[in-house]
Regions:
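Alpha-helical membrane-anchoring segments
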Residues: 1-286, 291-303, 310-318
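Thiol/selenol-based redox catalytic cores and closely related redox-interacting motifs
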Residues: 317-413
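Short cysteine/histidine-rich zinc-coordinating motifs and their immediately flanking basic loops
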Residues: 302-306, 411-413
Length: 413
């Protein structure tokens, strides 16, 4: 089974950074408790007390002193940081997985439902094509440089998630509190529940409403796997479960579980669920002697896989004279200018927002958030970057970036 998806190189980098920060926080938060949880002087003084200890060559088989445990946690934090910045990221994913699995094998009492998912994602990450292998589009490459999330890995993640949710719901059928609808009330009354206005307000609701919420959550879990077979229902199921986990994050002080599950949902998110409009005839004019502008062009080439992609031309070329009236050109900035499908000329932050919305997926969400910022502030930030771009990113002699032969038709002359 394969599932096509809309992940692109740039969007998956956002996942990588988010994932890496989560792992870094996880290991750093464990540092003060490491000796108590995993060492020979902790709650399980002997590793053999764990039924999982000998399932594979555990890191702590030969040595589990408090100092060694903390050194391993610190090393895992460093590996996570390197993964965050994309340095040997696939190797770092395997290294983090090994520490992750060893810690769980040494003390399974730390377990929560998200830990196996995170371990699986680490291994899956190691099998995903490198995000940097063709990061710079080469003029001699026959490949367009387009990166894609492998469809079989994406499908495997969805199958694993769907079956686990439905199995979790099935197991809840033998729980009296889930069957009589009082499970949510018990969660809100639990010592781990956050003492907030939201919790107090929910406890004040009629008993039937909490029961309805409990049974709705149970039905969602039970039906997740069969309903996920229907492609059009997957976004709705995904959003419903994310909403459920966000609710738990607000209500219950067990963030390590909830954030881990949200990481799984981020991995199974399909950017194609947020399609971009595909107008015809939009062009981007850029400063041909600006290193940052060349980088922007390469970024858009990597991210724009639409049927009617952007065309490009340098501001120093002849195409800009044919496309934009002289009276308008006199007022244009010398960085990036967009001419949309209606021949409107967009500059500064308006041009950035248009391009991001046009790329769809996570970029569309980012553009939507950016559009909430007053334009005066957006343009001020844009002008600040534009004023120092050549000092920081350098100048280029060639007005067109180096790109594969197949992409050269995207450049207007």
């Amino acid at each position: 089974m394969q599932m096509k998806n809309g992940w692109t190189r740039g969007q998956f980098r956002i996942f990588r950074v988010t994932f890496g920060i989560y792992l870094l926080y996880h290991f750093l938060s464990l540092l003060p408790w490491g000796p108590e949880l995993f060492s020979s002087q902790g709650v399980l003084s002997q590793g053999t007390m764990s039924p999982l200890f000998h399932l594979f060559p555990n890191l702590f088989l030969l040595w589990d002193s408090p100092l060694f445990v903390q050194a391993c946690l610190l090393a895992a934090a460093i590996f996570s940081l390197l993964l965050t910045f994309g340095k040997f990221d696939r190797v770092m994913a395997v290294m983090v997985w090994y520490v992750w699995a060893s810690l769980y094998g040494r003390n399974p009492l730390i377990g929560n439902p998200s830990l196996p998912f995170i371990g699986w994602i680490l291994l899956a990450y190691a099998l995903i094509p490198s995000l940097s292998a063709r990061d710079e589009l080469s003029s001699t490459s026959e490949d367009t440089g387009f990166w894609r999330m492998p469809a079989d890995i994406f499908a495997a993640a969805w199958i694993l998630m769907a079956l686990t949710y439905s199995y979790s719901g099935y197991c809840k059928l033998i729980s009296p509190s889930w069957m009589d609808g009082t499970a949510l009330h018990h969660v809100l009354s639990n010592p781990l529940a956050r003492d907030t206005v939201v919790r107090t307000s929910l406890l004040a609701l009629p008993a039937w409403s909490l029961k309805a919420a409990t049974w709705s959550a149970l039905f969602l879990e039970l039906a997740f796997a069969p309903l996920a077979l229907i492609r059009r229902l997957r976004p709705l199921l995904w959003v419903a479960m994310v909403g459920l986990h966000l609710g738990l994050l607000v209500l219950v002080n067990f963030s390590d579980l909830t954030i881990g599950m949200l990481i799984l949902h981020f991995f199974t998110f399909d950017p194609a669920w947020i399609p971009s409009p595909e107008p015809v005839g939009q062009s981007i004019f850029y400063d041909g002697h600006c290193g940052l502008c060349h980088g922007l062009v390469r970024f858009i080439l990597n991210e724009d896989h639409s049927a009617h992609p952007f065309s490009f031309a340098p501001l120093q070329g002849e195409e800009v004279k044919r496309s934009i009236a002289e009276s308008v050109r006199a007022e244009l900035p010398d960085s990036v200018v967009v001419v949309d499908e209606n021949k409107n000329v967009l500059t500064r932050s308006a041009a950035v927002i248009y391009v991001l919305k046009r790329l769809g997926g996570l970029w569309f969400l980012g553009a939507t958030l950016l559009s909430l910022v007053p334009r005066t502030l957006r343009d001020l930030a844009y002008d600040g970057v534009a004023s120092v771009r050549k000092r920081i990113f350098g100048r280029t002699e060639e007005v067109c970036p180096l790109v594969p032969r197949q992409l050269r038709a995207r450049f207007l002359h």
